[in-house]
Structures are given as structure tokens and as C-alpha cells.
């Protein structure tokens, strides 16, 4: 038995090979590198993660409509008459058929439309978050300032333009433009989100794989960031 144990011990176990599973095919693509001329005053030396987190929470909360509402016992239709007398029937006492414990009665503590979901974030914190998110893109060399000159509405032409920049396969392409032709041309491109300069927010910058900005929009962004300091 001792010899058998020695034989088993002498057998070398093969080394396990590490297998890398690529879940997202788009993540395997090499993003192009852009060196955009961005005013250094728009950037920050240190990215503030907490400011980004607070601003995104505030932006998401502001998008909530808050139109949900249910009927409580005061709003539900029905008689307020007492179903039966208080004593003498042997049954439990009840005050109204509109009580929440009755079928068809009102909802107790249900959601009401008067609730306000907005979260206040200071202006300086919002600006710090915006500049931090922009700094992250600039550090990743994912910002390009270029005019998309389009004489007519054409999704094909815009798609070819994006292909020439090697960004057509990226998942989140953010295009900032004030041109209505560019807006309509990009409407059917699923991976392209077109916004105006005043509509660009922190969450959009954080989710972006690449940020394409026209010169006119870049001037507006610069005024927006530096004008509030």
C-alpha cells in the first residue's frame, strides 16, 4: 500500500490553463485615440468620483415624473354609511365599506403624486462633476472636435463618416451638434446619441465611449463651463 501511495504522489498534475471569456465583443475592439484641443480650464487635476455620483443621482431623480397615485379611502367611490350597527350582531365592527380592509376599499399608505423626488446638488458640485467626467474622456483620448458638414439628411453619409473615424462599432457614441441635419441623419443609428451642448449631462459623459463635438458646440460648452465659474 505504501508503494501505491508513492506512485500516486509521483504523478505530476498538469497546470490549469487560464481561460479568458470575452462577454462583450464591442469591448474587445480597440478604440481610436484622439487628441482634442480642449481648454485646460474646463478640466480638473483630480477626478471627483463623489461629485459624479451625486450629480447622476440628481439627474435621474429629476427625470422621474412622479405621476403615480392610488385612491385612498377618501378618494374611492362608495357609501360612507356604516355597514351594520356597532354592537349586537356578533360580527366585527366596521365603520365604512371604503375601509382599506374591505374588498374594493381604498389603499392604505399608497403612493401619491404629491411626492417630490428631486435631489438638490449645489451648482459648484454639478460643475465639478461635469468637468471631472469630461476630464476622464480627455485622459482616455476619447474626445474629437470636428465639424460634420452635411448638405442633406443622409444616414448613410453620416455612417460612413463615423466609419472613417473608426467609431462606428463602439456601443455609445455621443455626438454634440447644433445642426438639425446631423440630428435627423443620426436618428436611426442605435449606437449614436445626438445632443445639443446645453443638453449634455454628467451621466451621458460617463457612459460615452467617444465624444464627438462640433466646433460651434465646443464654444457653447466652453461658455457653459467657464461662464459659471
UniProtKB/Swiss-Prot annotation:
Keywords assigned by UniProt, alphabetized: Ribonucleoprotein, Ribosomal protein, RNA-binding, rRNA-binding
InterPro entries from the UniProt entry: Ribosomal_uL4, Ribosomal_uL4-like, Ribosomal_uL4_dom_sf
Stored Gene3D superfamilies: 3.40.1370.10
Any Gene Ontology biological process: translation
Coiled-coil residues: none
Biased composition (Basic residues): 82-97
One Pfam family in the UniProt entry: Ribosomal_L4
GO molecular function, one term: rRNA binding
Region annotation Disordered: where it falls in the sequence: 62-103
One GO cellular component term noted in the UniProt record for this chain: ribonucleoprotein complex
Subunit organization: Part of the 50S ribosomal subunit.
Similarity-based family: Belongs to the universal ribosomal protein uL4 family.
Function in brief: One of the primary rRNA binding proteins, this protein initially binds near the 5'-end of the 23S rRNA. It is important during the early stages of 50S assembly. It makes multiple contacts with different domains of the 23S rRNA in the assembled 50S subunit and ribosome.
PANTHER family noted in UniProt: 50S RIBOSOMAL PROTEIN L4, LARGE RIBOSOMAL SUBUNIT PROTEIN UL4M
Protein's name in the database: Large ribosomal subunit protein uL4
Lineage, top ranks: Bacteria, Bacillati, Mycoplasmatota, Mycoplasmoidales, Metamycoplasmataceae
Gene coding for it: rplD
Amino acid at each position: 500500500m505504501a508503494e501505491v501511495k508513492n506512485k500516486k504522489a509521483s504523478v505530476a498534475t498538469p497546470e490549469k490553463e487560464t481561460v479568458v471569456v470575452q462577454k462583450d465583443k464591442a469591448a474587445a475592439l480597440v478604440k481610436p485615440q484622439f487628441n482634442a484641443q480642449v481648454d485646460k480650464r474646463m478640466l480638473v487635476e483630480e477626478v471627483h468620483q463623489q461629485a459624479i455620483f451625486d450629480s447622476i443621482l440628481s439627474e435621474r431623480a429629476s427625470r422621474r415624473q412622479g405621476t403615480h397615485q392610488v385612491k385612498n379611502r377618501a378618494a374611492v367611490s362608495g357609501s360612507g354609511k356604516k355597514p351594520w350597527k356597532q354592537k349586537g350582531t356578533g360580527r366585527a365592527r366596521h365603520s365604512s365599506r371604503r375601509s382599506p380592509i374591505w374588498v374594493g376599499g381604498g389603499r392604505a399608505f399608497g403612493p401619491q403624486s404629491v411626492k417630490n423626488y428631486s435631489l438638490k446638488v449645489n451648482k459648484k458640485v454639478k460643475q465639478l462633476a461635469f468637468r471631472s467626467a469630461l476630464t476622464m474622456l480627455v485622459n482616455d483620448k476619447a474626445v474629437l472636435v470636428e465639424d460634420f458638414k452635411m448638405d442633406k439628411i443622409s444616414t448613410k453619409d453620416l455612417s460612413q463618416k463615423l466609419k472613417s473615424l473608426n467609431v462606428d462599432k463602439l456601443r455609445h457614441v455621443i455626438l454634440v451638434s447644433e445642426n438639425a441635419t446631423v440630428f435627423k441623419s443620426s436618428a436611426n443609428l442605435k449606437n449614436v446619441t445626438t445632443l445639443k451642448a446645453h443638453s449634455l449631462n454628467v451621466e451621458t459623459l460617463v457612459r460615452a465611449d467617444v465624444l464627438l463635438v462640433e466646433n460651434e458646440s465646443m464654444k457653447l460648452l466652453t461658455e457653459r463651463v467657464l461662464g459659471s465659474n
